[in-house]
């Protein structure tokens, strides 16, 4: 189901799954493969989260060198859908080259594009992102795009062929939670492709808020990997995403300035 669909129009079947680039998934939690103490912990956390998709930094994770521990031996491609990403790329050329190498290595064409502006904030460079997106789409890739929370750029990315829009909630690895709910709501309401919060989630309540706003899914890495107990946090995130989605579909009560008694006042003794 696309995020812009309202709760009233949801069917039981569409509620249970979401689809990106023609691929359907049940889990709405995507997890990363960085910052864990080892691949075994990473794999255990991904399973505890109930994740079906794991995102992989092609430039930082060992996928092909058999002399070193291989991610694929722990987080198995037969168990998870790999989503190669361009973490660490600061130019469109680097991003395009990285994803072409990923496709050659593993045959992956569903990818996550991120082109960063500077090492301090890791904000996306939106001009470079849009330029490289067009090149990748022309080259046959299905591209999910990390972007700013700017509704105008989100629309431009979708028009350029992005299969999913992934606005940041806060800077990557900051754990600050969703800082601009208004813009995120606007992006969700206008999008005809899935919208996922990408970056900034710090704890379970942040994930729940993103889902309550109507996101199709949440992507996170540091919130789980740097928790004191990554496996327990992965479980918490799984339940938070489910709870947030259920709350969105249920439709929250209206906020009121004054009290409204839970029990009727008529007929008091």
UniProtKB/Swiss-Prot annotation:
Annotated EC: 2.8.1.10
Residues annotated as binding 1-deoxy-D-xylulose 5-phosphate: 173, 199-200, 221-222
Active site per the UniProt annotation: 112
GO BP terms: thiamine diphosphate biosynthetic process
Pathway the protein takes part in: Cofactor biosynthesis; thiamine diphosphate biosynthesis
GO molecular function per UniProt: thiazole synthase activity
InterPro entries: Aldolase_TIM, Thiazole_synthase_ThiG, ThiG
Major location category of this protein: cytoplasm
Oligomeric and partner information: Homotetramer. Forms heterodimers with either ThiH or ThiS.
PANTHER family, sorted: THIAZOLE SYNTHASE
Protein name: Thiazole synthase
